[in-house]
Design a protein with these regions (language model features):
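N-terminal acidic leader/helix
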Residues: 1-23
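Short alpha-helical "recognition helix" segments of helix-turn-helix
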Residues: 27-28
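Short, charge-rich amphipathic interface segments used for partner binding and complex assembly
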Residues: 32-57
Length: 57
């Protein structure tokens, strides 16, 4: 389960992307979460997914 606090979500998602997943799509598939839900939550605090960096920046 991913945290509901957006700052914690950012930290956890970026850590998982860095350490365990080659893409946001792979993370979402494995954790059975919506990519749109994560990207919308993090967009709300000014972050967007960068495919080149495989991180939210």
């Amino acid at each position: 389960m991913l945290p509901s606090d957006t700052i914690m979500l950012l930290s956890v998602v970026n850590m998982k992307l860095r350490d365990s997943y080659a893409s946001l799509d792979a993370l979402c598939d494995d954790l059975d979460v919506s990519e749109e839900e994560i990207t919308a939550a993090l967009a709300g605090i000014g972050y967007a997914y960068s495919k080149e960096r495989n991180q939210f920046v």
